[in-house]
Amino acid sequence: MNVLFLPQSGALGPSSRYRVYQLLPHLRAFTSEVSPAIDDDLYRAIYLTGHGSKLAALYATWKRRQADWRRVRDFDVVFVQKGFFPGLYAGLEAAMAAQRPLVFDFDDAIWLPREGGSPMLRALHRERAVQTILHRATAVIAGNDFLAEYARRFNANVTVVPSAVDVARYPRAAGSTVVGWIGSRTTLPYLKPLADVFRQLGITPRVIAAGTPDFPADFRPWRLETELDELAQLGIGLAPLPDMPWERGKCGVKILQYLACGIPVVASPVGVQRDLVRHGVNGFLAETPEQWRDCLKQLLDDAALRQRLGAAGRALVTERYDVSVAAARVAKVLAASAQTKGMTGKL
């Protein structure tokens, strides 16, 4: 079976890396071709350095996807990751779905305009465009139950495949007391409300990110080639999130990364984070500043507790959130979709 994978970006983009590229070695039963909408150079310019134009990304996506549309009949199944222009336009996906079975995968609440995003894109955002893709797809893969619940309003053939990590690649953390966070330029603001907690505890958090924080931090620039080594130096992982609709759709990859290294986590009880972090078992859930302070202090003061919670976290990820588990589920969806002759799962 021949599958055309259409990710949003090259492997430098985290969503495409976790939802497509890391699965490919585990999908060798399929003949596959990967056609990213934008390459790593353009992704780096726009999302890592902040010097590129998102209009350039839209233009590159349009050119690439028009070329892909002309050749979809050469494949048995088309796998679309997150859409070409989520919330803006769904015409190309609909045209592809009319020619070949189309599997649509998404790991964010893309039907919502993102807070803090481009004012122009927010103004142009149309939820109907996302609904059209969900309606036309042969099958939908959602990164968590919150996303799946929305998708099932428009398509009966929805499978939940949580985001996963390749546990074997993650080194075990050394057991330090370094309190740290890993994330993107756009998610750095999630960490800032904890500034007073850090000050009260005398902590300077280590921040591994593409953007520079505007609060006191031990900043380490994020690089794909050094990411795992940087993670392994942490002793406690942070995952604060505001309880908002967009954040409820997130898939908790940073928590999976911490746990894969055997690092205990303190996280906000928002969305999938409530499922990944088992309070007192592999980390702690904290809502108020007082809870954050108390949970962090407890972990900082007790090396045995950090070790016990970290071991439980790595065991959980190995059993339920390893890339091999996710790839097996995706393989079933692809195989079933190829047998549908282009039928959709629309309601």
Regions found by a protein language model. Give the residues of each.
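Membrane-proximal helix-turn-helix segments that form the acceptor-binding/catalytic region
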Residues: W62-F75, P86-L88, L92-A98, F104, ...
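Conserved catalytic-core segment of nucleotide-activated headgroup transferases in glycan assembly
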Residues: A11-H26, S35-P36, A164-Y170, A174-A232
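C-terminal alpha-helical cap of glycosyltransferases
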Residues: V323-L347
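Donor nucleotide-sugar binding/catalytic pocket of nucleotide-sugar-dependent glycosyltransferases
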Residues: V103, I110, H135-Y170
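Nucleotide-sugar-dependent
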Residues: T186-P189, P221-A260, A267-D275
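N-terminal strand-loop element at the rim of the active site
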Residues: F5-R73, G211-T212
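Conserved acidic donor-binding segment of nucleotide-sugar-dependent glycosyltransferases
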Residues: H279-E290, Q298-A304
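A short, well-ordered alpha-helix in the C-terminal region of glycosyltransferases
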Residues: Q298, L305-R320, A326-R329
